[in-house]
Amino acid sequence: EEMLNFENYRDVIDDNFVEEIYQSSPLHDIGTVGIPDMILLKPGKLTSEEFEIMKMHSAIGGDTLRAADKEAGQHSFLTMGRDIAYCHHEKWDGSGYPFVLKERRIPLPARITALADVYDVLTSKRPYKEPFSHEKSKTIIEEGRSTHFDPDVVDAFLARENKFILICKSNQSTDELSPIQQVVQMIG
């Protein structure tokens, strides 16, 4: 929602875009169904070989949603979901995967979801880590400005910081929206 206020995105972001990204962003990690549980649920750091396998989830998810989109007759929800699944691990500086895209070559929904996903991971308990505070997570995101993240998406995140603090606090106690849906809805 915040990026509706950014002049250079007015031709791309409207209420329909916000609704579609809200609906399609939870598909970002759908490709993890193709990753062995011993890697997904590993309590410690992944080996380099395990990480290479884990990275395959982006292509698996994107391919799955591309096939579903083709079968369903090109629905914008699935097209956006496909772009997000493929590209949510791309980085602004071109050091991400699977396509090594950079800057505006990364689809906007994927750039927004990338930050939301990182915030969700940082502030959530995982098999390999305890949740970080909002402040620590914010610092990590700010440090990733113009390297990991689109600077405009970081600006949108910071403009809605008070709402992110609330998400962080309720992260483990709500069954309503997933944390990533809450984050994406506010940024987009």
What are these regions (language model features)?
Residues 1-188:
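Histidine- and acidic-residue-rich, metal-dependent catalytic cores
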